[in-house]
Amino acid sequence: MWKMMIIDDEYFVRMGIRETIDWAVHGVEIVGEADNGTQGLELACRLKPDIIITDIRMPGMNGLDFMRCCREKGLHSQIIVLSAHEEFN
């Protein structure tokens, strides 16, 4: 089974990702959720997920900084960005 994490500051977005798809049918287990990049990084370092779905705009550490820190820490998770954010600088 693939291990997956969801990181988004919006509870209903996390719930939608978690409950809209029957992840187990696709061989995916949701092993953790976080509502900001800092918490997400701590969980990712501990859980070592195969897949991470993250938002960009979040309080504290944003998604871009989160992805940079993941690479610096040697995490090899595949990261999928889902965001309504319009501008990336």
What name fits each language-model region?
Residues 1-3:
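Non-catalytic signal-transmission and effector/linker regions of two-component phosphorelay proteins
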